[in-house]
Amino acid sequence: MAEGGELMSRLLSENADLKKQVRLLKENQMLRRLLSQSCQEGGGHDLLPPRAHAYPEAGSPGSGVPDFGRFTSVADTPSQLQTSSLEDLLCSHAPLSSEDDTSPGCAAPSQAPFKAFLSPPEPHSHRGTDRKLSPLLSPLQDSLVDKTLLEPREMVRPKKVCFSESSLPTGDRTRRSYYLNEIQSFAGAEKDARVVGEIAFQLDRRILAYVFPGVTRLYGFTVANIPEKIEQTSTKSLDGSVDERKLRELTQRYLALSARLEKLGYSRDVHPAFSEFLINTYGILKQRPDLRANPLHSSPAALRKLVIDVVPPKFLGDSLLLLNCLCELSKEDGKPLFAW
């Protein structure tokens, strides 16, 4: 039964397609016959009146009137009358296959191709006219292609985005304010990310300032090369000898600080490079923070929440460890978290 029902539905669809093709053939033949009759009737008549002499005699009615304007106005009237009469004739014979159309609105679309064909060509609508006439002029095409060509297609227009307040309607003012708030939030997110890099930078500066007291210019000093810088600082520039006392003192300070930080989980093999990674990734603050206007930079809890919001989970544990180390050193020296 299922196969029989499928066969019947297939036969019905093929029958409907055949009826459509027969209807298109009839309309095509009628169109060609009417066009040939109109061409035969208008072939013997000259639409343009005989051209006047280039130099009319004196006192003639046509003297002083330009020829081209007169001929253009006279020639337009018969062509317009002939086009309109032929259009009405075709539209009256257009619903040739009304037995196939069940809805009362089917006759109107059938008249549209004829009117589009007979109407004078417009520069902006000739594409749509050619698309609608193509099934009538080539009835041997596939019925599926004809169906797709007859269906109206919507023009895809690019969306216009504007931010000027004068060009936006009243209802779109909220949309504009939303876009501006989003831009400001992106700027705020970038600033918060710089705070993460500033935490790593401040920790490195605290470590270097503790190991090398009295050294104001730390250009070229990093936590990773502290042992090398201890030897370089302990070497006298005059004779190249090593100041053993200074070397021993700097080494003891470095080992004592490393022992305190290792209790918090800090590793001399991992976290110096990780601090450089955070600084290069997020950057540092461009100007000195105002602690009275923004107490975020002096609150360990607020900084911890910011790090959780900004840093991805893969680097979150080590980033929080650097913050804990910075807070511990800030408690020992009594200075703010972000010391400038």
From Swiss-Prot:
One of its GO terms (biological process) is spermatogenesis. Its main location: cytoplasm. Residues 42-73, 94-135 are annotated as: Disordered. Coiled coil: none annotated. One of its GO terms (molecular function) is protein kinase A regulatory subunit binding. Residues 123-133 have a biased composition (Basic and acidic residues). This is Speriolin-like protein. The gene is SPATC1L.
